[in-house]
Amino acid sequence: MLNIYLKSKIHMAKITRKEVYYEGSIEVDEELMEKAGISEGEVVLVVNVNNAARFVTYVIKGKRGSREINLYGAAARLGEEGDRVIIMAFTFSDKPVKAKTIVLNEKNEIIQEK
């Protein structure tokens, strides 16, 4: 039987920009995506730590090294610049999966990898 497991998590990312009238979703620095094991276009669950909003969207690859986490389109209504979010990707598996997690500081720099 297949179960759904957490496979990747970017913990405590800080929203750097938002734009409501934009085609898109959540843009994540390419380097952070790679470190967390998240692919462009992958569906993610985003949890806003500041306001408890939860939403499902897809990832847009951002500029490598920019440390930007940007909300676009309708998702931009669910967060403000400076809010901290948790970005999670899941997978189907018949066996437990060890999630890859990166923890970020207030500058969206990696301070811990698990």
Swiss-Prot record:
InterPro entries: Asp_de-COase-like_dom_sf, Asp_decarbox
Co-factor note (free text): Binds 1 pyruvoyl group covalently per subunit.
Top EC category: lyase
Taxonomic superkingdom: Bacteria
GO BP: any one term: alanine biosynthetic process
Cellular localisation: Cytoplasm
Catalytic activity, EC: 4.1.1.11
A Pfam family the protein falls into: Asp_decarbox
Pathway(s) annotated for this protein in UniProt: Cofactor biosynthesis; (R)-pantothenate biosynthesis; beta-alanine from L-aspartate: step 1/1
Chief site of localization: cytoplasm
Signal sequence range: none
Keyword Lyase listed: yes
Active-site residues (renumbered): 25 (schiff-base intermediate with substrate), 58 (proton donor)
Swiss-Prot/TrEMBL keywords: Autocatalytic cleavage, Cytoplasm, Decarboxylase, Lyase, Pantothenate biosynthesis, Pyruvate, Schiff base, Zymogen
Record-listed Pyruvic acid (Ser) modification sites: 25
Residues the record lists as binding substrate: 57, 73-75
Entry annotated with the keyword Chaperone: no
Cofactors, names only: pyruvate
Family stated for the protein in its record: Belongs to the PanD family.
NCBIfam families xref list: panD
Subunit comment: Heterooctamer of four alpha and four beta subunits.
HAMAP family cross-referenced by the UniProt entry: PanD (MF_00446)
PANTHER family the record matches: ASPARTATE 1-DECARBOXYLASE
Protein name, UniProt field: Aspartate 1-decarboxylase
Originating organism: Thermotoga petrophila (strain ATCC BAA-488 / DSM 13995 / JCM 10881 / RKU-1)
Native organism taxonomy: Bacteria, Thermotogati, Thermotogota, Thermotogae, Thermotogales
